[in-house]
UniProtKB/Swiss-Prot annotation:
Subcellular location: Cytoplasm
PANTHER family: MITOCHONDRIAL DNA REPAIR PROTEIN RECA HOMOLOG-RELATED, RECA
Keyword Nucleotide-binding attributed: yes
Record function comment: Can catalyze the hydrolysis of ATP in the presence of single-stranded DNA, the ATP-dependent uptake of single-stranded DNA by duplex DNA, and the ATP-dependent hybridization of homologous single-stranded DNAs. It interacts with LexA causing its activation and leading to its autocatalytic cleavage.
Name of the coding gene: recA
The species this protein was found in: Levilactobacillus brevis (strain ATCC 367 / BCRC 12310 / CIP 105137 / JCM 1170 / LMG 11437 / NCIMB 947 / NCTC 947) (Lactobacillus brevis)
Annotated segments matching region Disordered: 329-377
Protein name: Protein RecA
Amino acid sequence: MADERQAALDKALKKIEKDFGKGSIMRLGDNSNLEVETVPSGSLALDVALGVGGYPRGRIVEIYGPESSGKTTVALHAVAEVQKRGGTAAYIDAENALDPAYATALGVNIDDLLLSQPDTGEQGLQIADALISSGAIDIVVVDSVAALVPRAEIEGEMGDAHVGLQARLMSQALRKLSGTINKTKTIALFINQIREKVGVMFGNPETTPGGRALKFYATVRLEVRRAEQIKDGTDVIGNRTRIKVVKNKVAPPFKRAEVDIMYGQGISQTGELLDMAVEKDIVDKSGSWYSYGEDRIGQGRENAKQYLADHPDMMAEVNQRVRAAYGVGDEEAAATKATETKTDAPKDKDKGKTKAKDKPADVTPGQIELAPDKSAK
């Protein structure tokens, strides 16, 4: 009986492969690439919170939060990390608000960044589809879902009712995009705003525009919120920002990362490194004093951050120990291997797809000392 069932299964598998092509069905264990390929987020703390060392390739990521919370900053750091590893990035600026000078300050190479400022939501999503389908793009950022206005609303009169148009647009687009995103290993990063649901008496009244489709299709959803202001005397020089992993299909969710977003500098590498080093007892905190080994590195967090920034050798040593403690890879080695992988990539019809052993760089997270938007979008 078992032999008959196996023979019937083998016959069905052969027919499926004949009808739909080789590789249309396979045993999961036969797939040599079982590890999740990732690209670092640009924040070591966020890489750890994500559980896999960064944003997963071939998946959809949503970043949402209140105004000026740092959503665009987080997205631009991801773009900078992709470019740092030799990848190609595209930015669909539906809000028409991207600041090239700020993007440059965060480490984005604006000469190589592909930018589109679409007139309608349909146009923006069609452009994203064309870019992703090319197989030559590593990350596409859509800023933002709320600004993807359907053509009917653009061409209509002010005050006209267009119930559910944007939700239908997003649902249709994501049905089409999800398969292509997975095949091309592109990261599709959607920035979203928040709205208040009317009449909610109990529970959280906040929701995100664009319907429910994005919530379902997203592998990772990040909630970005300002926690407190960072001051130098009476001057506000940045924000302490909490990033919560609300949804995660590739690792346990609900982890948090706290980062300093400094005006004009972005996510502070020294700030998160200091916090993580204290958490793992690599740096000792006694009262307001911070010490590393026999060296006192500062009284107060801001002074300790500045000391690390002024002593790159010590910072590199602390960075290495923190990465080892959290089980994430070395940044410089990752960038080097990524460049080698890009050079050695296969040239045949599977161009753009590399084996797991050829892409260790994209599985290890890295950091870059960068910066928040001046309005901390």
